[in-house]
């Protein structure tokens, strides 16, 4: 994207950010300060930037809160994850989420679960597209790690590996119980 267009990123300040910032092909404006104040400073900086740069075509946000205070009619895309939108229907937080998400052009959900949750909570279905998280494939696993894995799993007949956060809603315990029942 940055090879074809000018990209400007507004991001939170992190120690040693220069190490990362110097490796990318786009401009990063870092915003420091306490979290609550940072939210307002960042939105002020973005609104000011949009006023001064009329060639901006699209805003991409990683969270609905990032768009909450942005005042523009430019195209907006917002990424969503279930934990950040999962507020009881009709609650003040749910109403805030809906007022932001139903006023963006496109919403990118990271799973069918998140898409369905968003729809159930009142987000317009036609705006949602799913892009599942990707992974960086390892071209070759070092022998050391293969040996460690073999040692841990030595003598084990069944091997199940899950790559995810251990979260109640992911139902890991049901999978384990189902596998145990298969064994019997």
Predicted segments with their positions:
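N-terminal strand-loop element at the rim of the active site
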Residues: 2-38
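Acidic anion/phosphate-binding donor-loop and adjacent secondary structure
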Residues: 88-91, 119, 134-152
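Conserved donor-binding/catalytic core segment of Leloir-type glycosyltransferases
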Residues: 152-170, 176-179
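Carbohydrate-associated surface elements
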Residues: 13, 113, 134
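Short His-centered aromatic/hydrophobic patch
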Residues: 61-66
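A short beta-strand/loop micro-motif in the catalytic core of glycosyltransferases
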Residues: 59-60, 103-111
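Nucleotide-sugar donor phosphate/pyrophosphate-binding loop at the beta->alpha transition
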Residues: 38-44, 74-77, 82-103, 144
């Amino acid at each position: 994207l940055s090879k074809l267009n000018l990209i400007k990123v507004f991001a939170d300040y992190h120690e040693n950010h220069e190490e990362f910032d110097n490796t990318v092909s786009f401009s990063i404006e870092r915003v420091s300060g306490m979290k609550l104040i940072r939210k307002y400073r960042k939105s002020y900086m973005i609104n000011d930037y949009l006023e001064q740069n009329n060639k901006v075509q699209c805003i991409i946000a990683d969270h609905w809160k990032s768009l909450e205070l942005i005042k523009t009619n430019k195209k907006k895309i917002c990424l969503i994850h279930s934990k950040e939108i999962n507020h009881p229907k009709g609650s003040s937080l749910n109403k805030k989420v809906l007022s932001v998400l139903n006023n963006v052009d496109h919403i990118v959900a990271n799973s069918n679960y998140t898409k369905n949750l968003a729809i159930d909570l009142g987000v317009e279905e036609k705006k949602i597209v799913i892009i599942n998280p990707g992974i960086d494939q390892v071209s070759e696993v070092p022998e050391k790690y293969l040996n460690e894995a073999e040692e841990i799993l030595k003598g084990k007949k069944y091997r199940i590996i899950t790559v995810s956060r251990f979260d109640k809603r992911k139902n890991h315990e049901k999978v384990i119980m189902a596998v145990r029942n298969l064994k019997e």
